[in-house]
């Protein structure tokens, strides 16, 4: 039986977590990016758990960028996730954007 969209996303997040724990940051970044960019084939594929997996991947990727001081990548992440928000509840969208904005402001290399 084929994996569902949600199972695929959840599996990739787990793989990325493992890569990050093993200090394979480059691999973790790629996997988190794949989760964020992966589009649902059908609207019903975008379950609450699939949205949660994308949200978790976004936060974890943002934290990697913050830890590494990658200001431009963090700003680009904010721009690249905008298409996701079509499917997200407005409250979740606001929370994610506020969190990413706050992370960006906390970076040392960010000019205000």
Predicted ranges, named:
Residues 1-112:
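Extended alpha-helical scaffold regions
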């Amino acid at each position: 039986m084929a994996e569902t969209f949600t199972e695929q996303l959840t599996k990739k997040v787990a793989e990325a977590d493992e890569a990050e724990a093993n200090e394979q940051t480059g691999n973790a970044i790629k996997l988190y990016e794949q989760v964020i960019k992966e589009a649902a084939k059908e609207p019903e594929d975008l379950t609450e758990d699939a949205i949660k997996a994308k949200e978790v991947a976004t936060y974890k990727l943002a934290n990697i960028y913050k830890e590494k001081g990658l200001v431009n990548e963090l700003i680009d992440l904010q721009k690249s996730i905008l298409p996701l928000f079509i499917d997200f509840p407005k409250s979740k969208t606001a929370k994610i954007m506020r969190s990413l904005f706050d992370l960006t402001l906390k970076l040392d290399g960010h000019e205000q």
